[in-house]
Design a protein with these regions (language model features):
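A short helix-to-beta-strand connector/capping loop
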Residues: 1, 21, 113-116
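N-terminal glycine-rich anion-binding loop in soluble enzyme alpha/beta folds
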Residues: 4-68
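Structural beta-sheet core signal
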Residues: 5-7, 87, 119
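Short, surface-exposed connector motifs at secondary-structure boundaries
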Residues: 57, 81-86, 115-116
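N-terminal glycine-rich phosphate/adenylate-binding segment common to multiple enzyme folds
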Residues: 68-101
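Active-site histidine-anchored catalytic micro-motif
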Residues: 90, 96-150
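Conserved small/polar residues in nucleotide/adenosyl-binding loops
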Residues: 154-155
């Protein structure tokens, strides 16, 4: 079965870096003083995010995890196309992103009981999660199935 690799934005892979290895990113939301949350990497460039931090050192950004609906919106077309999903999330110690993805999976399994959706808590964050995601992409390119890839990360 063909499958897609999905990762949350905590892996720090955006744009060409994610596209090059065939990974779709579900972004986190960020806000500064105005409290308008924007999708990191999609609605606010990562470069702009860091520029805001440098130019306003006393203003601390707030973040919010991807919602269940964000994951449903990404998983649904993949499942409808008959493909599997391997979703890699930031450690549950830092975020509820994994729980959002699990809830989205459970919702989709109600309508698509044969869907193959694996959600993995990477137990990592930022660059380390990115390395984890790159390794998953390498394993997929080497021909490992969704199940083989998921098992290698959960055991």
């Amino acid at each position: 079965m063909e499958y897609k690799i999905i990762a949350d934005g905590a892996c720090d892979l955006y744009g060409e870096n994610a596209d090059k290895i065939g990974v779709q990113i579900v972004p986190f939301y960020v806000a500064f003083e105005e409290n308008v949350y924007k999708k990191e990497g999609a609605e606010i460039e990562v470069r702009h995010f860091y520029k805001e931090m440098v130019e306003n050192p006393t203003v601390f950004p707030k973040t919010s995890m991807p919602s269940v609906q964000d994951y449903v919106d990404v998983f649904t077309p993949i499942v409808k196309a008959g493909e599997g999903v391997l979703c890699i999330c930031i450690t549950t110690k830092f975020s509820g992103s994994y729980n959002s993805a699990v809830n989205a999976r459970n919702m989709l399994l109600e309508d698509y009981p044969d869907a193959k959706i694996e959600v993995i808590d990477s137990t990592l964050n930022t660059v380390e999660e990115g390395i984890f995601v790159r390794e998953a992409a390498r394993m997929k390119a080497a021909g490992l199935s969704l199940e083989e890839s998921a098992v290698s990360y959960t055991h």
